[in-house]
């Protein structure tokens, strides 16, 4: 069964375009025996419900970390993650290992769009990329043991790709009573493509290959199919989930005109 879950919230009126904007979410559950599937679905649905109820005009940069924490609480409250942790780690069939001995958890990456900005907030190793003018930029960094070692200069990216600790998550929803989300704001431009994906894609397909596929495939449905096919061809055994969003137009003064995003 697929332990990934995708979701989005689109504005239903011109007023909501300005007051709410757009939200896109992707979660990759961990735990096996359907625990991961429950966790990822609960994470996305909790975030969707919270986003629909946001006060008018609230800043996404403060909202998204709060929604991540609400999703974390929902998973903890489900009763599958105890508040007191041991040092043991749990490995699920997909290979991911959770921090703190948790047996039900999920990654989560969110991208909210309004005016000329994209706010990205995440926990775990699900990613968000920005594709622009033939270049691909990662807007997130993985919360894994090897990624932290790379940032500290202890190992190289090549060593990390095959390292024994590459599946050990240092942060995940449901692993603790509080989880810290990393949040970033970037400007967006017409023609930009935002890509949310699970490690079922980036764990098997290089950033260069992802960039080439997105840049050479204008149709988002075909691009998504090509990305999944590339992951499978590379021997991917994990769930592969991809969400692509194209920015059609941006109004810097506070209005989007028309339907600015092409959602897959």
Segments and roles (model prediction):
Residues 1-264:
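PP2C/PPM-type serine/threonine phosphatase catalytic domain
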């Amino acid at each position: 069964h697929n332990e990934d879950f995708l979701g989005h919230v689109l504005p239903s009126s011109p007023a909501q375009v300005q007051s709410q904007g757009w939200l896109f979410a992707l979660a990759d559950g961990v735990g096996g025996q359907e625990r991961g599937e429950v966790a990822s679905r609960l994470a996305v649905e909790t975030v969707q419900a919270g986003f629909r109820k946001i006060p008018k005009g609230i800043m996404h940069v403060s909202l998204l970390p709060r929604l991540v924490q609400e999703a974390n609480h929902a998973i903890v409250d489900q009763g599958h993650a105890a508040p007191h942790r041991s040092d043991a780690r749990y490995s699920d069939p997909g290979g991911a290992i959770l921090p703190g001995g948790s047996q039900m958890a999920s990654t989560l990456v969110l991208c909210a769009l309004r005016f000329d900005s994209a706010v990205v907030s995440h926990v775990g190793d699900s990613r968000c990329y920005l594709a622009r003018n033939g270049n691909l930029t990662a807007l997130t960094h993985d919360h894994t043991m090897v990624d932290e070692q790379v940032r500290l200069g202890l190992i190289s990216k090549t060593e990390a790709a095959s390292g024994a600790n590459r599946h050990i998550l240092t942060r995940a929803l449901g692993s603790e009573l509080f989880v810290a989300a990393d949040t970033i704001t970037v400007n967006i431009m017409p023609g930009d493509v935002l890509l949310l994906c699970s490690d079922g894609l980036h764990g098997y397909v290089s950033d260069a290959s992802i960039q080439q596929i997105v840049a050479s495939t204008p149709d988002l449905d075909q691009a998504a199919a090509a990305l999944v096919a590339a992951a499978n061809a590379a021997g991917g055994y994990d769930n592969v989930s991809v969400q692509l969003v194209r920015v059609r137009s941006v109004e810097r003064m506070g209005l989007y005109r028309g339907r600015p995003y092409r959602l897959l």
